[in-house]
Amino acid sequence: MAKKYCYLFSEGNANMRELLGGKGANLAEMTNIGLPVPQGFTITTEACTQYYEDGREINPEIMDEINRYIVKMEEITGKKFGDKQNPLLVSVRSGARASMPGMMDTIATQSGNPRWAWDCYRRFIQMYSDVVMEVGKKYFEELIDEMKTKKGVTQDVELDADDLKELASQFKAEYKAKIGEDFPTDPKEQLMGAIKAVFRSWDNPRANVYRRDNDIPYSWGTAVNVQSMAFGNMGDDCGTGVAFTRDPATGAKGLFGEFLTNAQGEDVVAGVRTPMHIQEMEQKFPEAFAQFTQVCQTLENHYRDMQDMEFTVEHGKLFMLQTRNGKRTAQAALKIACDLVDEGMRTEEEAVAMIDPRNLDTLLHPQFDAAAIKAATPAGKGLGASPGAACGKVVFTADDAVEWNERGEKVVLVRLETSPEDITGMKASQGILTVRGGMTSHAAVVARGMGTCCVSGCGDIVMDEANKQFTLAGKTYHEGDYISIDGSTGNIYDGIIATQDATISGDFGRIMGWADKFRVLKVRTNADTPADAKKARELGAEGIGLCRTEHMFFEEDRIAAFREMICSDTVEEREAALEKILPYQQGDFEKLYEALEGCPVTIRFLDPPLHEFVPTEEEDIEKLAKAQGKSVEQIKAIIASLHEFNPMMGHRGLRLAVTYPEIAKMQTKAVIRAAINVQKAHPDWTVAPEIMIPLSCDAKELKYVKDIVVATADAEIKAAGSDMKYEVGTMIEIPRAALTAGEIAKEAEFFCFGTNDLTQMTYGFSRDDAGKFLNAYYDAKIFENDPFAKLDRDGVGQLMQMAVKNGKATRPQLHCGICGEHGGDPSSVEFCHQIGLDYVSCSPFRVPIARLAAAQAAIAEMED
């Protein structure tokens, strides 16, 4: 049987979203429940896919079916397409199955009589030129403005039939000047041109970015709705409007929306005239308004969610043009979900499943004032690496950030890229802006952990660090100049934009409570400081899945001792230097155990290569030489010897413990002593340290380091007269470790997937450099998503699945988690649930996102 590419609204229903798109499925559903919908048909998403397969052409089979359905519309309406006496006038609109407001191009095609007809016709020429032929709207807007000036009026509605007729003529001339041919007059040519334009819009740059941000596959395609026209611009007894069944900003129950008399739908959306509040429609059109309020109630009860509707009143008669689940703020989403449960319309599981976890970000961070940000124009754009809004004076070094902050100045730290040395400056800043680096760069990861706004990878910035200035969009910014950055969108603004503090309502607690009832995955946090750990606990973390010990070495009072260790010539000298650091490490760990109140804490031993810790400033090198009793030249020679061509795959992780076992011994002593002390202070807690050895690729290598750790730990426990239990596990972040997980599990008591490095090594991409070519990959349709932001299930995911399966076959009680940045990405959390991980670990401010995503994964599995 031949594939069916067209469906009348009466032939479809709400369950056919994949085929008819969201708009088409909802038009069919409204038709089925007896609402007043201008009739028409939907061209399926499969026709869009076929259009691309056929080299961006509508093939004869699909064209014939479209023509047959036009005939069916003629039979339904009693009008004839292209007829001068009784024309069937249609609109052609996109219908992607996921709502894409403002991303898809929409066309209304019409023709007709006197003022109304010329108004329709000039609109049609303008929209057809803009959307189908891609002639910019601005040329036509300029002609309209000239006409209004000439006639001494301010609004389009004040132009009469002759003015509009003249405009139509000017528009046609503009079309010919731009396109080089006459405006088409054949309705069938216009119709096919409009349908092709909607198909084309599926592949426009805005739609591609939107899809990537919202996990919508390119392969879905868009449907096209061909619908008989309802006119709101035929006179004062006509109008058009957009309304929501609840307030999309607050979630409050009640009709919210706008209405315009004698206008078409795009006038409301485009804001060319100031509309009336929806309640004022009652005075103008009492009967249509009464019917509309009834329709709103019917739709909300039917879909059991807040609805966003478009409608037209033609000579007092109501027509529904669209309904969809309305976009809403995160705050409104929580209120609506809770209210729908209280009203008996939704179950707790359904309420949890309704919330987009990614939107919770905005509840936990400062945001820009909505009106101020709407009025502002970005000066540039990077990657929205850590959400929130920041405004402050530009500084270029971490030291300056600290100094300015101490004197009460709010600052934004601008760097080419950040390194662990910049931590203190990052903490002192309102926000961080980097020229280089991606979503998992050092700046991004650390900023997310601290809950600080960060925009990374703005390659348009021309940096001049020597003179403490940078240039963006033709303007040079000096130290002390104000900028504002949006860590959610990646936008960068000149000057000051007002911000608002984050607010969390009681609805947040209710939704999170329900989520915790349903989820199976535990949620931990990546935290290196007691403050981070405390914040994560407040947001619901059940332990620490990753504590990076190297960040602790950069504190002023301990970096000197660590540098002494690096520059030592003998084991004894190294041990003496490490002995100075031991009490600091122990103190840090005690504070973390205290903050976690007996919840599990996974401590990763030293991971970065040693060159990251050595001084770069002449003054610091001289200080180190003096402390070591060496010459400056000797210290410089040691620093030079630490240089590596590929440090990511160099002398780091457990390789450091193999060559310098004394480092692992010191860290083990610190972990165990801290745990014993905290356990003694809190006998009712269970303090059970988890020691994580990073970067293993071979079971023998892991055994070598584990033996050192176990011997040291057991000696400490025996000396303290304790019976403390501890575990030693490893990070799976090298493909070979995943492939040999069965062997590695003989030594490891737990696995934690470090998916940042596992992704780098599986792809062979550097996460800090991938931004240079990923956009080209998106444009070429090679990739649809950033593999560092959304877990690659086909490659990295398969390695993880294999490692879990083989590891648990060797050691059934092996527990497995993830601590890469993917631990806070909802689709990645879903995958972790599916492959049987025990926990995910993410930055503190992503903990609620992970809790909700884990619950949704469990609910989806129950439904299957």
Task: Identify the meaning behind each predicted range.
Residues N13, A96, S228-N233, A398, ...:
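Short, flexible loop/turn elements at secondary-structure junctions
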Residues I504, W514-D864:
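Conserved alpha/beta-domain cores
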Residues K381-E421, L472-R510:
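Extended, non-globular alpha-helical segments
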Residues M1-A375, E403, E409-V412, S419-T424, ...:
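Nucleotide/phosphate-binding sheet-loop regions of phosphoryl- and nucleotidyl-transfer enzymes
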Residues F41, V435-G437, S456-G459, C547, ...:
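Short beta->alpha connector loops at strand-helix junctions that form conserved
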Residues I195, L364-V395, R510-T525, D532-K535:
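Flexible inter-domain linker/hinge segments
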